[in-house]
């Protein structure tokens, strides 16, 4: 019986070692794939300024620039990126409002990654207010985010960028045709 037990534990150790080797190879290949996707996509994506804080009152659908604060680098340039990963940390909804906290992963304009903590608070009263805040996370480890989800989101952003550019180009073409058709005397 002891001999069977020893063989069993040896087999477990052997399988664990093989599993770790396979897992390490998967991580390496996933990281190479992600790096290649970022390298290709970063030239096609339209990156947006990342807000630090914004407040919305009375359920208005419009944001006013004085109600939004953005992140800036040490040179005063706005940080730009796209949200490519999200992990919900907490969520609470009650009779008067609610709040949620997420960990977010952004692909930055320079191809680097930045992890943020996102907090949203809202109320349901007649004078509704929604408050959204982001802070740069202390832990910048991106391994907790799903690589397949990140790649899917990057591809969607490239598609969104294409749609936006085509729409804007078509608007400009219309404007150009209109201007050309006007007679200037």
Explain the meaning of each model-derived region.
Residues 1, 9, 29-31, 64-65, ...:
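Serine/threonine-rich low-complexity intrinsically disordered regions
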Residues 42-127:
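Amphipathic, interaction-prone secondary-structure segments
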Residues 24, 31, 58-59, 75, ...:
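Detector for Asparagine
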Residues 4, 14, 33, 61, ...:
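Arginine residue identity/basic-tract feature
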């Amino acid at each position: 019986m002891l001999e069977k037990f020893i063989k069993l534990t040896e087999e477990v150790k052997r399988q664990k070692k093989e599993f770790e080797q396979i897992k390490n190879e998967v991580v390496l290949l996933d990281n190479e794939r992600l790096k290649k996707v970022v390298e290709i996509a970063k030239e096609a994506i339209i990156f947006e300024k990342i807000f630090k804080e914004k407040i919305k009152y009375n359920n208005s659908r419009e944001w006013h620039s004085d109600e939004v604060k953005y992140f800036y680098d040490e040179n005063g340039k706005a940080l730009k990126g796209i949200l490519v990963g999200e992990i919900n940390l907490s969520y609470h909804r009650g009779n008067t409002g609610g709040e949620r906290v997420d960990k977010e992963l952004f692909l930055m304009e320079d191809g680097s990654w930045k992890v943020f903590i996102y907090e949203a608070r809202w109320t349901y009263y007649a004078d509704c207010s929604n408050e959204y805040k982001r802070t740069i996370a202390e832990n910048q480890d991106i391994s907790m985010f799903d690589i397949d989800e990140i790649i899917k989101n990057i591809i969607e952003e490239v598609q969104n960028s294409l749609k936006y550019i085509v729409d804007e180009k078509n608007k400009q073409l219309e404007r150009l045709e209109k201007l050309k058709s006007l007679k200037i005397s």
